[in-house]
């Protein structure tokens, strides 16, 4: 489903978060390639880079799908034939002028009602809803896979690099700095996304959403939940 974009201040700010994501991916990838371009003749390095590039491709693909897929909108004239007038009053959105099905919420960032809304994610500059939640989960899977691969492939090179820097503390180029920074950022990202993925895996397995979980925790009804 083609995404319908509403131009709001939150939407414009979301573009900045998307650029941050792309910048992090580029930095981590560049730090890995700085090391492995010097070992391309090694079969194990070739295998590692092949698997890494496949995982990275799937990460970028799922990121694009989660960002560009419309999360879902209320079908035209839905709910006009509901018999309970009190229910119709409670489920009517005064901003979109539609009757909202269950789990449909109005997102102030997107300025629209979203089907089966889980939360608004600024990192993909989109709501996670009915049609793109699977892509969002795939994105988390491939982020974890890619960050774990980078951590596995760069731990010993970074360890050796730090030992060399301890013995010879004079740095003559930028490569050691970028490699260490990229590795540290990758490990941090792997830890954060691991907890985030565990939370969303629990939501999927229990057939619930972030908004419902936050409502149970005492958030105000209608409050936009974002990651």
Regions found by a protein language model. Give the residues of each.
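Membrane-associated feature with strongest affinity for ZDHHC
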Residues: 1-227
